[in-house]
């Protein structure tokens, strides 16, 4: 098995904070493994995910994903990396209550500048996959 993710001695220091957000964190994830991140409020989970996803950069240390040192990516490369390699599942989701279910599903695709035809096709595929096609025209609640 090859190493998919290598986190080596990551530290994240925030200005005016008494302790680091991350303090010399190191671990590896091998291809095919799953990793769960748990901890108390304020323990650094969100900070870790932010640096792993290139939303933030560590103060020191290195992160390699597929052999690439991700904190050295340009903003454009980092955006492409997030789009093509990462997925997020949020604990608490947010729907725009002024939009229909269909429009809420379409928001990320619209932000990616997909064509209207592509958006409609993908939204319908997802709606059918999750059994919510009959709910698409309803306002989100």
Model features per residue range: what roles?
Residues 35-36, 88:
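Short beta-strand immediately N-terminal to the Walker A/P-loop
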Residues 53:
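Helix-to-loop junction immediately C-terminal to a conserved catalytic motif
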Residues 99-108:
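Short coil-to-helix segment of the ABC ATPase nucleotide-binding domain corresponding to the Q-loop/switch region
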